[in-house]
Amino acid sequence: LKVPDLPLPESYKKALELAKDDLAREIXI
């Protein structure tokens, strides 16, 4: 997942990290 190099709201960055964690868990990493 490519994260844009832009200033993002903390809530958005947190949601993005949670989404990546969920994705990794599903794949199974």
Curated annotation (Swiss-Prot):
Main location: secreted
Residues annotated as signal peptide: none
Record key words, sorted: Neurotoxin, Secreted, Toxin
Keyword hit for Protein biosynthesis: no
Gene Ontology molecular functions: toxin activity
Tissue distribution: Expressed by the venom gland.
One GO cellular component, as annotated: extracellular region
Top-level taxonomic group: Eukaryota
Record localization: Secreted
Family listed: Belongs to the scolopendra toxin 8 family.
Protein name: Scolopendra 8011.73 Da toxin
Organism: Scolopendra viridicornis nigra
